[in-house]
Regions:
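Short, surface-exposed alpha-helical segments at coil->helix boundaries
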Residues: 17, 42-53, 104
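Conserved hydrophobic residues forming the short capping helix/wall of the S-adenosyl-L-methionine
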Residues: 24, 52-56, 80
Length: 122
């Protein structure tokens, strides 16, 4: 499976990175990591990219890492459609005190607009 993982620096997206790398290793998935700007994250994109590359260097997986400029949700959807990805993976989905799932604006846009399946990792 050809998987596009969006990582924006939130703790959820870094957790999604670990989980998606594990799955790619187990399933033989082709992984591309898109480092996106997330206005809700305190970590800048340089640091996010460094962490992504560090995580990938510790496993026997060749993955493409790219910096994606512009609106993160729109760009992830565009890339998935234009490059033939089978799935978009994203971190997100905190549970509220009332038991409802709260998702960020990037994940919401991707879930509502992606032409492929979306794997939301919590």
């Amino acid at each position: 499976m050809k998987v596009l993982l969006g990582v924006g620096g939130s703790s959820d997206s870094l957790t999604a990175l670990e989980a998606t790398v594990e799955r790619a290793l187990a399933a033989g998935d082709e992984l591309t990591v898109a480092v996106v700007e997330n206005p809700q994250s305190d970590i800048d994109t340089d640091e996010v990219e460094r962490r992504v590359r560090e995580e990938l260097s510790s496993v026997p997986l060749e993955a493409d890492v790219r910096r994606v400029e512009g609106d993160a949700g729109s760009r992830l959807v565009e890339i998935a459609e234009s490059e033939g990805f089978d799935q978009i993976a994203l971190g997100g989905g905190q549970t509220s005190p009332m038991g409802k799932i709260n998702i960020g604006s990037i994940a919401e846009f991707v879930l509502l607009n992606a032409p492929v399946s979306v794997h939301l990792i919590r």
